[in-house]
Regions:
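Short, low-complexity N-terminal leaders and the immediately following helix N-cap/first helix
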Residues: 1-63, 115, 131
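Short, glycine/charged-enriched hinge/interface segments at domain edges or termini
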Residues: 2-4, 54-138
Length: 139
């Protein structure tokens, strides 16, 4: 039996080191990166909604609860003020989560009223929020 160091030495003697080359992205199929890819920013750059619905405080997600709708936020826009308890903001997929909100109530789980929304008796408990940097982080 040989030692670990001897076995490692034998294995490393079989390794062929190769140079790297720069190629266009179109020519990179089935190739391996020679250096790490480093991002200059987080993606997404802020918490975003994963579904169409209403941005709310998680504590407000209670069956049959009425919430006022105080505005709307779409992808590429923002909502100026913070959400308070008992309030919601109409939100669409990819839109930034308004300040004060930490969950999305999907639209299928609500009943639209003139004065706001009511949460259905049975509703999805998930938050439906894509956290800042969940795809990749800077660095």
């Amino acid at each position: 039996m040989i030692s670990f160091e001897q076995a490692l030495s034998k294995l490393l003697s079989l390794v062929e080191y190769i140079d790297f080359e720069e190629v266009k992205l179109e020519e990179a199929h089935c190739r391996v990166l020679a250096v790490d890819a480093i991002s200059s920013r987080d993606q997404p750059p802020f918490d975003t909604s994963a579904m169409d619905g209403y941005a709310v405080k998680k504590i407000d997600k209670v069956p049959n609860k009425n919430l006022s709708v105080i505005g709307k936020v779409t992808a590429g826009s923002s909502f100026a003020r913070s959400i308070n308890k008992g309030e919601s903001v109409r939100i669409f997929t990819g839109a930034p989560m308004p300040k004060g909100s930490n969950s999305v109530l999907i639209q299928e789980d609500t009943i639209q009223l003139e004065s706001g929304i009511t949460i259905r008796e049975k509703f999805e408990k998930k938050d439906f929020v894509r956290k800042k940097g969940c795809d990749y982080k800077a660095g």
